[in-house]
Design a protein with these regions (language model features):
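Conserved beta-strand/loop block within the catalytic cores
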Residues: 21-37, 42-43, 47
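Short connector loops/turns at beta-strand edges and beta->alpha or beta->beta junctions
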Residues: 34, 59-63, 140
Length: 224
């Protein structure tokens, strides 16, 4: 109600660079695997509104430049398109697949790397600063305690999905620059190869790129 009555206050705070996001509320939802849970960070109504506005603008500018092999968190894209990539690769003789697993992807996004990538195209420092504030927003636990955060982009808000695609588009472009075929849905990705030896080389080199260039962590136990 306050937002509706005083929209100018919110606008002026954003323009002046004085807007401060509230802590996100941590909650858990069960995963398909029994006993496993996914942590979400739920923003306030006002923060969700601001995040959604930022996400819409980012999507407008970035989405047209994304790889055609990226299918998650995008308008007019769906999981079935990733399946079509797999079928098409199989038809063309690709019999080996590197299944890359990024360990706790959303929870481990490096803030400095994210800001660096955004700054390549966004020249308004106020926008970069506001996004950085959302990335660093405190986390309120169920017991009322508040935790500081120096990495990660909490799932549960409208901004994290587009930021994830902006970051991982660097990976898409690297794979394509090497002449490789792949398909990605959010942080789930497969790379297609024609021989076992090629798959092993690709797995090693792409793992190195992910960890050294994007500062993410590959789960070696699940990557195969």
């Amino acid at each position: 109600q306050h937002i509706c009555r005083h929209p100018h206050e919110l606008t002026e705070a954003i323009r002046a660079g004085t807007y401060r996001p509230s802590p996100v509320l941590r909650t858990e939802i069960p995963k398909e695997e029994p006993g496993k849970f996914r942590e979400l960070g739920i923003p306030t109504v006002q923060d969700r509104l601001v995040q959604q506005a930022i996400a819409q603008v980012l999507s407008f500018y970035y989405d047209p430049t994304f790889s055609t092999r990226s299918h998650g968190f995008r308008p007019n894209e769906k999981a079935h398109n990733a399946i079509y990539d797999v079928l098409d690769a199989a038809d063309k003789g690709y019999r080996w697949v590197v299944d890359m697993d990024l360990e706790k992807f959303f929870d481990t996004i490096n803030h400095a790397k994210m800001v660096q990538i955004l700054s390549e195209r966004i020249k308004d420092g106020r926008v970069i600063s506001l996004i950085h504030k959302f990335l660093r927003a405190d986390v309120q636990l169920k017991n009322g305690h508040v935790e500081k955060r120096d990495k990660g982009a909490p799932q549960g808000g409208p901004l994290s999905p587009i930021l994830a695609n902006i970051l991982l588009d660097k990976l898409d472009k690297e794979i394509e620059a090497r002449g490789l075929r792949h398909s990605r849905y959010a942080d789930d990705m497969v790379i297609f190869c024609k021989t076992k030896r090629a798959a092993e080389r690709v797995c090693a080199s792409i793992t190195e790129f992910i960890e050294k260039k994007l500062l993410l962590k590959v789960n070696r136990d699940k990557t195969k």
